[in-house]
Regions:
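N-terminal beta-alpha supersecondary unit
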Residues: 1-66
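Surface "functional belts" at beta-alpha junctions
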Residues: 22, 28, 34, 88-180
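A general structural signal for well-ordered alpha-helical segments in protein cores
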Residues: 36, 40, 79, 96, ...
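Generic hydrophobic alpha-helical segments
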Residues: 39, 43-46, 50, 96-100, ...
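Stable alpha-helical structural segments in soluble proteins, enriched in small hydrophobic residues
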Residues: 46-50, 85, 103, 184-194
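Phosphate-handling active-site elements
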Residues: 50-56, 83-93
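DPxDG-like acidic metal-binding loop motif
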Residues: 61-89
Length: 201
């Protein structure tokens, strides 16, 4: 199964193709200026550059946030259109979930944080790859305390607010900043091949 992943929940958007042997192709966009029609054109070019046809796609995976409402709406609209046109399933993957997966932390706890503007952050905490609770929308001071607590436990912190907004110095290797379509596609493929039911985006 080859899966198309879309992520436009942050200013840096991306699209990627993930197959049985891993990443096939990836492209990045300025999500602040992106419209669904432009994303569809970009996806068509991405598929062609990978030497594929749209009919080769077996599922679509989309970043469903939290993040930019406008950006998420663009990716969801594009994914719904592509999935409906091809008659393939679509899967939603949370932006914080993709960030945590990219940290490749193994058994260590992970906290993922994304800029929510207005001195706030979207926060998700994970234990052994699973969400430890619901995602939260927190004041930066509270988010910082959560991140420091996770790091004190030997955990990993990822996200675009860690240094610029929270002033935290990151441990070596913790450079994951934003959700990436490659991870969205990878996680979507895992759900597709395991027979997970699709859900409304």
């Amino acid at each position: 199964v080859i899966v198309l992943g879309l992520s436009t929940s942050t200013p840096t958007g991306s699209a990627a193709l993930w197959g049985p042997d891993g990443l096939l192709a990836e492209e990045r966009y300025d999500a602040l200026e992106l419209h669904a029609e432009q994303l569809l054109v970009g996806v068509d070019g991405l598929v062609r550059r990978a030497g594929l046809r749209p009919s080769h796609l077996g599922a679509i995976a989309c970043d469903v946030g939290p993040g930019s409402f406008t950006g998420i709406r663009v990716a969801v609209a594009a994914s719904e259109g592509i999935a409906a046109g091809l008659g393939v399933p679509r899967f939603g993957v949370a932006s914080l979930e993709a960030l945590a997966a990219a940290a490749a932390a193994g058994a260590r706890p992970v906290i993922a944080l994304l800029d929510a503007k207005k001195s706030e952050a979207y926060v998700g905490e994970f234990e052994r790859g699973e969400a430890a609770g619901p995602f939260e929308h927190l004041d930066l001071a509270v988010a910082r305390a959560r991140a420091e607590r996770c790091l004190a436990r030997g955990g990993v912190a990822v996200g675009d607010v860690l240094h610029a907004l929270l002033g935290l110095e990151l441990p070596s290797g913790a450079s994951i900043l934003r959700p990436d379509a490659a991870w969205i596609a990878r996680m979507g493929r895992s759900r597709a091949v395991s027979g997970c039911p699709t859900q409304p985006l």
